[in-house]
Amino acid sequence: FLWTFRKNEKDVINLYNTMSPVMQLATGGSMLNFGYWSSKHVDPISAQDNLCDVFGNLSELSTAKNAIDVGSGLSAPSKLWRDSFPDLNLYDVNINFKQLCFSKHQKNIEFLNSTSTKLPFNDNSVDRVLALESAQHFKPLSDFIVESKRVLIKSGFLVIAIPITVNDSSIGKLGLLKFTWSSEHYSLDYLKNLITSNGFKIIDEMLIGSDVYDPLANYYVENRKTLSRTILEYYPGYMEKILYKSLLKMKKASQEKIIDYVLLKCILNNKSK
């Protein structure tokens, strides 16, 4: 588990190759995000789909032609967007080749094994760059933002959904995020400054942490007996205990305003060079 505390891309790949199946078992689906929970979205799959829907609508995918999903995971979000917006061409960029192979051939989705900081696209060639709960792993994040600026057309959007810290917080307070945030722990102010100083203007911001972390932890606690039985069929007991304790710490960190979750919609700042 040394790679859960280190920060290079190979370690992030190892992390997701190990933890992704646990998340799939716990949720019963192929989404790898925390979900956006509500009174109408009370289970993981529904909450995860809801986050993708909200993110897709924020990104105005209904009017988009070409969108890059950077750090696309198992491509479940892209499949949802493809089905919702049949005229949209999606390009799933993932440094993790094993994850790219999971989905096999898909209509209107092209899979590209590449890094987030060197996007394999021409200048001014796409109208959306999407990073749904993945940008926390991009190193350096500033290079991804610069690359997004390069490949976007003038009217394009960069849209990011990302866990953030609210105040300075030690890794010991982050719970599950010690494992899912294998890269930097960005504060909201730092993230916004990084985006605006690299040629973008933020035009929409949604802070949704209380509808992400708290209900996710509550769901696991309420259904732990069934979920742990499923997980223990494939993994040792300590894995389930780490997950359980981390979820509780994550909920506490959210309630204490140590962590939050933000969606940011950005356009190119025409005044920047």
Label the model's feature ranges.
Residues 163-183:
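Short, glycine-/aromatic-enriched active-site segment of Class I SAM-dependent methyltransferases
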Residues 68-118:
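Class I SAM-dependent methyltransferase SAM/SAH-binding core
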Residues 183-199:
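Short alpha-helix
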Residues 117-128:
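A short acidic, Gly/Pro-enriched loop at the edge of an enzyme's catalytic core
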Residues 1-25:
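N-terminal auxiliary segments of SAM/dcSAM-dependent transferases
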Residues 204-231:
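Conserved catalytic loop of SAM-dependent methyltransferase domains
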Residues 142-157:
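A short glycine-rich, Lys/Arg-flanked "PGG" loop and its adjoining helix->strand segment in the class I
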Residues 45-63:
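Conserved alpha-helix/loop element of class I SAM-dependent methyltransferases that forms part
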